C-alpha cells in the first residue's frame, strides 16, 4: 500500500440519457499511468451502492472505499484526463482541502446556491463568495477530512428522498452542497491553479493554439495538467476525448 491514493467514480449510470463507456477506459488509463508513475494507489468505482441512486453521490462515500490508512486522497470525475508528465499533486499541499475555482458561469453558480440555500434550513444562512466556490470534479484532501465527508454523506442519507427526486433543473446535484458545507464547517482550504482542473475549457479557449506565433501546441496540452471535459454536449465530449487519446496515448506507455 502506498501512502496516497486517488479514487475515480466511473459508473455507467442507467439513469443517464447518454453512454459514457466510449471514453471511460481512456480517462482511466491516463490516471492509472500517472498513479503508477508517482506510487499512488488508484481506485475505480464501477458499480453503484444499493443505497445511492445517482453515481455523482458516491464521491461522498470516499472513505468507505479507501479506508483510513492513506495520508492524502484525491477524488476525480470520470470525464477528467491527466497529462502524462504532470507532477505529483500530493507534493503541493499539506493538510488543506484543495480544489480549483469554478467561475465559468456566474449565473449558474448564483442560481445553484440560491436553490440549495432555500431548500435546506441548515444551509440557508451560509455565506459564500465567488472567490470560494470550487469545482467538485477534482478534489484533493487529507485523511483528517474524514469527519467532513461523513457529514456530507449523512446529509445525503438524511435528505435522500429529496435529493434523489430533486426537481429544480440546472443547478447540479452536489457541487454547491459541497461548497456550502466547506464554509459551514470552517474547513481550511487551498486554491489550486487552473492547470489542475481545466473546467470550462471550451469557453476559455483551451482547445485553440497560438496561430499568431505559428505555435501548433494546443493550449490544453501547453497549460493544463488535468483536463476536465465538462460543459460539453455528451456526444461532442465522447468524440473529443477519443480524439485526444488517439493523439497522445503513446505518451502513456
Q: Residue locations for each model-derived region?
A:
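Catalytic core and acceptor-binding pocket of nucleotide-sugar-dependent glycosyltransferases
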Residues: 131-239
